[in-house]
């Protein structure tokens, strides 16, 4: 049985990956400072180590103590707007934090890492669907930090033979149907939980930012991928590395685009609630259409999304939000 350190494993995507690791016979050890994660998202039988990504000595100690074989790295700050207002926080937490993690891995002789990257590394795409060799022109600090980490990983691979898989997510959504975990951010910035919180009455209204885009209904189109499908991809990437596979970069998306209006209409149908929607002006830096090509990971690792239909994504998220109107706190 192999031991996997999951940094940020008490967070939204990390907690779902912990579940998938357990299903596949791995032993996850969660390393999280709980600044945005939730201890309640970590199963009782899983070791939760409360620690900071910048503490190289403690990281090395934990890697040695638990005989860590590989790392899956989620720990990061991830609010696009905040990254533009407070870039120092993002370069410190994301770039310097990842450097500290890599140094701890090097010192502890841990040679495999799966990295949580983002479609934000592409910026405004020149064409869709977006492939891994598309231009990398991030338009915000968050995306730039993730791209810098990808470059660091490539350099560590070249210099120290530390193998990696970087996974560029599109829009993660949904919740586990088998465990009581879901999406709980403060502040919340993702469309589907915002919509569902409005349906619950936790929020007064949900806003559409821009209705004059060059799309079928004038609103932005995004590629939504179920968090459980993302979790499966992480385990496939890990198995690829442990089997001696070379370093890789993959997109993770459903390859289907849905507009903001389509998501809102689907949520109204699934919840049976006609909540208030308001129209606002565009936000700067929002591309009209972002849709992934996941052909590369499908061809190389056999990853196929199994539950990333809009109905499945919204239905599983709605079930979790109904049971947790105040998130993990209530």
Feature map (PLM): residue ranges:
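The catalytic Tyr-centered alpha-helix of NAD(P)H-dependent dehydrogenases
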Residues: 127, 138-145, 184-191, 223-227
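N-terminal Rossmann-like NAD(P)+-binding domain of SDR-like oxidoreductases, especially those catalyzing
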Residues: 1-175
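Pocket-edge positions in alpha/beta enzyme catalytic cores
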Residues: 51, 63, 90, 183-187, ...
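Short, flexible, glycine-rich and Lys/Arg-enriched loop motifs at helix boundaries
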Residues: 39, 170-191, 201-222
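C-terminal substrate-binding subdomain of Rossmann-fold SDR/epimerase-dehydratase oxidoreductases
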Residues: 194-330
């Amino acid at each position: 049985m192999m031991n996997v350190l999951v940094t940020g494993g008490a967070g939204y995507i990390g907690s779902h990956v912990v579940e998938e690791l357990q299903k596949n016979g791995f032993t996850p050890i969660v390393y999280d400072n709980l600044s945005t994660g939730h201890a309640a998202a970590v199963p009782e039988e899983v070791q939760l180590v409360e620690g900071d990504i910048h503490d190289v000595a403690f990281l090395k100690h934990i890697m040695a103590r638990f005989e860590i074989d590989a790392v899956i790295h989620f720990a990061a700050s991830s609010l696009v707007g905040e990254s533009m207002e407070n870039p120092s926080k993002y370069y410190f937490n994301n770039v310097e934090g990842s450097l500290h993690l890599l140094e701890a891995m090097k010192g502890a002789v841990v040679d495999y890492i799966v990295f949580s990257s983002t479609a934000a590394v592409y910026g405004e795409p020149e064409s869709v669907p977006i492939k891994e060799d598309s231009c990398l022109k991030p338009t915000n600090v968050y995306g730039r930090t993730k791209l810098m980490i990808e470059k660091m990983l490539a350099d560590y691979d070249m210099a120290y033979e530390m193998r990696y898989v970087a996974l560029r997510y599109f829009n993660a959504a949904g919740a586990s149907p088998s465990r009581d975990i879901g999406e709980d951010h403060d502040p919340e910035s993702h469309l589907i939980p915002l919509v569902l919180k409005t349906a619950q009455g936790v929020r007064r209204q949900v806003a559409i930012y821009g209705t004059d885009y060059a799309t079928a209904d004038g609103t932005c189109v995004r590629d939504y991928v179920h968090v459980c499908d993302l979790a499966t991809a992480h385990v496939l990437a890990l198995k690829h590395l442990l089997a001696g596979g070379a370093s890789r970069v993959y997109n993770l998306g459903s390859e289907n685009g849905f507009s903001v209006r389509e998501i809102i209409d689907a949520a109204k149908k699934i919840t049976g609630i006609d909540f208030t929607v308001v129209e606002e002006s565009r936000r700067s830096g929002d591309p009209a259409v972002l849709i992934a090509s996941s052909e590369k990971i499908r061809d190389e690792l056999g990853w196929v999304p199994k539950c990333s239909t809009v109905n499945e994504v919204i239905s599983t998220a709605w079930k979790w939000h109904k049971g947790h109107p105040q998130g993990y706190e209530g």
